Regions:
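Conserved signature/switch motifs of ABC ATPase nucleotide-binding domains
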Residues: 143, 164, 196
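Catalytic Walker B motif of ABC-type/P-loop ATPase nucleotide-binding domains
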Residues: 169-172
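ABC ATPase NBD coupling module
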Residues: 16-21, 73-95, 195
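Conserved ABC ATPase signature
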Residues: 144-148, 152-154
């Protein structure tokens, strides 16, 4: 399938103690519908920075990010958008899952999923309940985050990411706080999303996560060491295991 999200020549640098540090150096990345793509590399390699840029959370210093428009209208060059249009595109086309869940502690699981809904008033709760059912939490909808396990909280976060039916799901270390059983459940859900035609991008240190991907890209010192199109997960798993042990 075609790329639903694409970075071209993306560069990013920061100033640290008076010195310029290049975090990303002209990176190209295509995240395709129907695939789970893993982005791997050691700490400081630029993985999360790239996720934030391609997720329209942080602007690049150079290069461009393209997001597939609605109804097959073709890729949108996000560098040409106003801040408001950029925010609208991000909310409607991209869904985010983070390691720390980022759930509001004073609200129920259901309310956490409903809050970002962009549709008609009155439709949000039904949509949220359906998504909680999909992730196996229909009976936990009225529970507070503190009453849920880590794995359950992450599934609430995934349901929230899907509430506006985005074609792209981005996840930063989504299994970092989970036990093996919860990890397997979450990875199964990501696979289902890709099988529906969505594009799924996972940033990870975890060999089990990269092994579950279709394509793996490896970052090192701000550049890809793998081919531009990535490599099949089975060819990359051994390298990820080595990195995790370092």
């Amino acid at each position: 399938m075609s790329a639903l999200l694409r970075a071209e020549g993306v560069g990013k640098s920061y100033t640290l103690r008076g010195r310029r540090v290049d975090v990303l150096c002209g990176v190209d990345l295509a995240v395709r519908g129907g695939e789970v793509t893993a982005l791997v590399g050691h700490s400081g390699s630029g993985k999360t920075t790239l996720l934030h840029i391609i997720g329209l959370l942080t602007p690049p210093d150079s290069g461009r990010v393209f997001v597939e428009g609605t109804d097959g209208t073709g890729p949108v060059d996000t560098s040409e958008l106003s801040d408001g249009a950029l925010a609208d595109l991000r909310r409607s086309r991209l869904g985010f899952v983070f390691q720390s869940y980022n759930l509001l502690p004073q609200h129920s699981a259901l309310r956490n999923v409903v809050l970002p809904f962009l549709g008609r008033r009155g439709e949000g709760e039904a949509r949220a309940r359906a998504l909680l059912g999909r992730v196996g939490l229909a009976e936990r909808a009225d529970h507070l985050p503190s009453e849920l396990s880590g794995g359950e909280q992450q599934r609430v976060a995934l349901a929230r990411a899907l509430v506006n039916d985005p074609p792209v799901v981005l996840a930063d270390e989504p299994t970092g706080n989970l036990d093996t059983e919860s990890e397997e459940v979450l990875l199964g859900l990501f696979r289902e999303l890709a099988d529906e035609g969505r594009a799924v991008l996972l940033v990870t240190h975890n060999p089990a996560v990269s092994d579950a991907a279709d394509v793996v890209h490896r970052l090192d010192k701000g550049a890809f060491t793998s081919p531009a199109e990535g490599v099949p997960a089975e060819n990359a798993a051994e390298r990820v295991e080595t990195e995790s042990a370092e």
